[in-house]
Amino acid sequence: MWNYLFGGNKQQKKEYPKKAIVELREHIQMLNKKRSHLESQIADQDALARKYITTNKALAKNALKRKKGYEANLMKIENQIDSLETQLTSIEGANLNLETMKAMKQGAQAMKQIHGEYDVDKVENTMDDIREQVELADEISEAISRPVGTEFVDEDELDEELAMLQEEEKEHKQQTPAQKAPVAKVSAPEEEMPDFPTVNKNKPAASTEDDEDEEALKALQAEMGL
């Protein structure tokens, strides 16, 4: 223990809390067994005293004395168990705090290592580089999307050529004679068709003469283009 407090191997210091916890638990377990044994002995002596209380007072008295001795030992054992359990709880809590501190320390070291790779100035420089590259990409995109060849055309020359074309079109219209108004074509009156007797299709043919009249009518219509 003194080596743990004032020096000694680091690995031993690391394992000492765990070892102390294990030993305390084992000792408490042993004391609990001892307490159970004393409680059994107290019960036996109490039963023996009750058995001889009327027939043999000397045996009953000796049994009570042994019972008192066992009860005194039981009280000491229970006090020891209480002390060890209190100490065990404290050590477990301290060990838990130690493990928590170790985890927090490792987390702090990890953050320190991460932040060691960059700082505020490096972040600002990186953001400036990003903005510069974005602007460059926009310029490149604009240059690529610009029509090829149109930048070499003279706008004044185009306006002059357009004015010449308009002047030529104006002169051409002045030189072209006015066209005569179209004369409406008078169509000849259609020749009226003679009235023909209506033929009842549902009525059966009365005679061969009616069939001949029907054939003549069809021939006349075909001749007239109807």
UniProtKB/Swiss-Prot annotation:
Membrane topology: Peripheral membrane protein
Domain of life per record: Eukaryota
InterPro entries named in the record: Snf7_fam
Residue stretches in coiled coil: 18-177
GO biological process: protein transport to vacuole involved in ubiquitin-dependent protein catabolic process via the multivesicular body sorting pathway; vesicle budding from membrane
The keyword Protein transport belongs to this UniProt entry's keyword annotation: no
Pfam family, one: Snf7
Main location per the UniProt record: cytoplasm
Protein name: Vacuolar-sorting protein SNF7
Organism listed in the record: Debaryomyces hansenii (strain ATCC 36239 / CBS 767 / BCRC 21394 / JCM 1990 / NBRC 0083 / IGC 2968) (Yeast)
Gene this chain is encoded by: SNF7
